[in-house]
Design a protein with these regions (language model features):
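Cys/His-rich microdomains that often coordinate metals
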Residues: 79-80, 96-97
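Solvent-exposed beta-strand sheet faces enriched in polar/charged residues
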Residues: 30-32, 63-65, 108
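Short hydrophobic/aromatic patches at helix-to-coil boundaries
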Residues: 109-113
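Immediate flanking context of iron-sulfur cluster ligation sites
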Residues: 62-71, 82-84
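Short Cys/His-rich "knuckle" micro-motifs
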Residues: 83-86, 100-103
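Short cysteine-rich clusters marking metal-coordination/redox-active sites
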Residues: 73-76, 90-93
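Long, charged N-terminal interaction/targeting segments
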Residues: 1-60
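Cys/His-enriched microdomains
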Residues: 71, 88, 105
């Protein structure tokens, strides 16, 4: 379950930022995670519940935004193509698509108090 390691890293970053800014608690953590990352949301939330105990994030709210997988075609200039079947070929011309969204894994913001 790599979600435990991911959440451990997120909480370490959040704790470091809280320390740097003199915050006594972390009220909220908002994440943006792309579909292409293969992160299981329920497992990440479970890891958050388990790992936040005894940290500044113990009472924090976790918000996770899932970024849909999208691509563009370099040949026919089609942009914002949804990739529901995970095929990386353009349905119109057969060119290999370029992923433009869905790879994200970032802390969008921390609410520190």
């Amino acid at each position: 379950m790599h979600e435990m390691a991911i959440m451990q890293g997120i909480l370490e970053i959040a704790e470091g930022e809280a320390e740097k800014h003199g915050a006594v608690r972390i009220a909220e953590i908002k994440l943006r995670i792309g579909e292409f990352r293969g992160v299981v949301r329920d497992a990440l939330e479970f890891a958050f519940e388990a790992l936040r105990q005894g940290t500044r994030a113990e009472q924090a709210v976790l918000e996770i935004e899932t970024v849909p997988l999208r691509a563009s075609c370099p040949n026919c200039s089609e942009r914002n193509i949804p990739l529901n079947d995970f095929s990386l070929l353009c349905r119109d011309c057969g060119s290999i698509l370029t992923i433009i969204a869905g790879r994200e894994m970032e802390i969008e913001y921390l609410d520190l108090e």
